[in-house]
Amino acid sequence: MSRNSYIQQSSDIQAAGGLVPMVIEQSARGERAYDIYSRLLKERVIFLVGPVEDYMANLVVAQLLFLEAENPDKDIHLYINSPGGSVTAGMSIYDTMQFIKPDVSTICIGQACSMGAFLLAAGAAGKRHCLPNSRVMIHQPLGGFQGQATDIEIHAQEILNIKARLNELLAHHTGQSLETIKRDTERDNFMSAARAAEYGLIDSVYDKRQLAS
């Protein structure tokens, strides 16, 4: 499992030091080494770290589907630390989260901005969380298409369509009115963890891990 497992955001990891910690486990059949992300995947933990783009989204989707196949009745925990990124890549993760049978719990560590915030809010109801010093930011989708005037007009209309769809989904997941979402995403809107909970983007702020009694 150590090779066909979770190897994500290698550039971010290399920038942080170049080495991924390894975990050694012993069993009756001897020792086995896992990189730390692979070991956590065994515990149904997935990391969404860095910009949301197609390659990273494919890895997250694959892990969601794998964990569903392993146990369709046990929660999956998605840890998010992302500045946002591609809408289409993010929507592939979103649709898979809604499609699979297990509940997907979302936890923001660091930041969840733009598409990262959208995915944070898309977790299972009652299972969306932030750590206390993380931040969340929502805004409207960005566009920067260049080309012929007619093509620019086509892409501008598509951005408006995407904006409308994202606003509808965000209203659904937060419980806010559509008009409130439209107003609050007009510009970059940063929130503390506590404010994100008040707004409905998350359900609670975690100070300490909740241990089973």
Curated annotation (Swiss-Prot):
<keyword id="KW-0720">Serine protease</keyword>
<dbReference type="InterPro" id="IPR023562">
    <property type="entry name" value="ClpP/TepA"/>
</dbReference>
<comment type="subunit">
    <text>Fourteen ClpP subunits assemble into 2 heptameric rings which stack back to back to give a disk-like structure with a central cavity, resembling the structure of eukaryotic proteasomes.</text>
</comment>
<dbReference type="GO" id="GO:0051117">
    <property type="term" value="F:ATPase binding"/>
</dbReference>
<dbReference type="GO" id="GO:0009368">
    <property type="term" value="C:endopeptidase Clp complex"/>
</dbReference>
<feature type="active site" description="Nucleophile">
    <location>
        <position position="114"/>
    </location>
</feature>
<dbReference type="InterPro" id="IPR029045">
    <property type="entry name" value="ClpP/crotonase-like_dom_sf"/>
</dbReference>
<dbReference type="InterPro" id="IPR018215">
    <property type="entry name" value="ClpP_Ser_AS"/>
</dbReference>
<dbReference type="GO" id="GO:0005737">
    <property type="term" value="C:cytoplasm"/>
</dbReference>
<dbReference type="GO" id="GO:0004252">
    <property type="term" value="F:serine-type endopeptidase activity"/>
</dbReference>
<keyword id="KW-0645">Protease</keyword>
<feature type="active site">
    <location>
        <position position="139"/>
    </location>
</feature>
<dbReference type="InterPro" id="IPR033135">
    <property type="entry name" value="ClpP_His_AS"/>
</dbReference>
<protein>
    <recommendedName>
        <fullName>ATP-dependent Clp protease proteolytic subunit</fullName>
        <ecNumber>3.4.21.92</ecNumber>
    </recommendedName>
</protein>
<comment type="function">
    <text>Cleaves peptides in various proteins in a process that requires ATP hydrolysis. Has a chymotrypsin-like activity. Plays a major role in the degradation of misfolded proteins.</text>
</comment>
<keyword id="KW-0963">Cytoplasm</keyword>
<dbReference type="GO" id="GO:0004176">
    <property type="term" value="F:ATP-dependent peptidase activity"/>
</dbReference>
<comment type="similarity">
    <text>Belongs to the peptidase S14 family.</text>
</comment>
<dbReference type="GO" id="GO:0006515">
    <property type="term" value="P:protein quality control for misfolded or incompletely synthesized proteins"/>
</dbReference>
<dbReference type="InterPro" id="IPR001907">
    <property type="entry name" value="ClpP"/>
</dbReference>
<keyword id="KW-0378">Hydrolase</keyword>
<dbReference type="Pfam" id="PF00574">
    <property type="entry name" value="CLP_protease"/>
</dbReference>
